[in-house]
Regions:
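Short metal-coordination and nucleic-acid-contact micro-motifs, chiefly zinc-binding Cys/His arrays
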Residues: 139-142, 159
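Acidic, turn-prone loop/beta-hairpin segments
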Residues: 6-65, 69-96, 112-134, 161-162, ...
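A glycine-rich helix N-cap at a beta->alpha junction
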Residues: 101-114
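Short cysteine-rich clusters marking metal-coordination/redox-active sites
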Residues: 143, 163-166
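Cationic, low-complexity basic patches in intrinsically disordered or flexible, solvent-exposed regions
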Residues: 3
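Cys/His-rich metal-chelating microdomains
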Residues: 149-152, 169
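Basic, alpha-helical nucleic-acid-binding regions used in initiation and control of genome expression
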Residues: 146
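Short linker/helix segments within small regulatory modules
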Residues: 153-161
Length: 180
């Protein structure tokens, strides 16, 4: 359709526009660039296939819990949500390696880990053994740039509608992420 054709053209233009404004040397076009060679990973690596398969399974359980909240009208989208994962110590230790980036893997505004024994009755049991999920609507303001709901919005005079992460990305050195 005409709409699809127009949207595809816009995506192409935006990719090139972003590419032109990235710092550093690079190929003339995003479509002429090469991908980085990543080191091989296997299931025995600390953050190998087994780790990421488990993270995806946890995310599926979180998505299921968010759908229930969405159906009840408590949240509109995943970035409106904060999530508490009540997990066994083994699962909790594994997920703790992601640090603050757990919320990016889950695509939520907030993510906390807690002991499985502390799970309230309303926490949902999913497919991942040793995990219960509690989703709640975030009370924080929504960042105009990334749409995450963060408590620090309004704390930056030069960017009053942005979260700290976005201020760092817009005016500072840029955030450092390791996993997600």
């Amino acid at each position: 359709t005409q709409l699809q054709s127009s949207a595809a053209s816009d995506v192409y233009k935006r990719q090139e526009e972003i590419w032109e404004n990235l710092p550093g040397e690079r190929a003339a076009s995003v479509f002429l660039s090469e991908w980085y060679e990543l080191p091989a990973s296997d299931a025995s690596d600390a953050m190998g296939d087994t780790f990421w398969s488990c993270c995806l399974a946890v995310r599926q359980d979180v998505n299921k819990a968010m759908e229930a909240e969405r159906a009840q009208g408590n949240i509109r989208g995943s970035l409106d949500a904060n999530v508490v994962l009540y997990a066994t110590s083994e699962l909790r230790q594994m997920l703790e390696t992601l640090g603050d980036e757990l919320r990016f893997v889950l695509i939520t505004s907030g993510a906390e880990l807690a002991d499985l024994a502390d799970a309230p009755a309303e926490a949902l049991v999913g497919h991942v053994e040793g995990l219960k999920v509690l989703v709640s609507a975030s009370d924080a303001e929504k960042c105009d740039r990334c749409w995450h709901r963060r408590d620090d919005i309004g704390s930056f005079e030069e960017h009053p509608t942005l979260c700290g992460r976005c201020v760092t990305n817009v005016s500072g050195e840029g955030e450092v992420r390791h996993y997600a």
